């Protein structure tokens, strides 16, 4: 279970939901100065929420995310300046913007997904110092069958890696014009690296 310790929660209700016998409906909510405890086993629940949710926007400010393992040991503490989750049928995207810090590195992240795609998504993670930009395009079928393209910009170098996960095998391949060339297959069951 995800645990939340908050000191400041604001819920913005639609005015027509205040009348008697009406369903309460909110427009958005904001949370500030909150500690979120996220267990690793809850990752898929959170992922499915963002992919499948038709929820209203939410905003989180000046909070911390604690990632906890199955033994209740803290693996990661990430201070968050802000998180914005918005859904808009007008521009046909769900978007999750995060500005925070991970392992003493400031970052900005944008995840977005079209309403019409089932599980396909894009993510950009931009670290300030050192200046690293990571972009990923994911085409998702199911947990054992997905592929995508990851692009990493670092020190004026760009590396693009195509990846494919299918039938317990991971294939990684980079273009020949990259300074770093990758062409490998990893068998997951039994584990074997080629």
Which residues does each predicted region cover?
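Flexible beta-edge/linker motif
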Residues: 1-71, 76-79, 86-101, 108-110, ...
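Strand-loop-strand
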Residues: 118-119, 130-194
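Short beta-strand segments that buttress and anchor functional surface loops
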Residues: 1, 96-100, 122-126, 149-152, ...
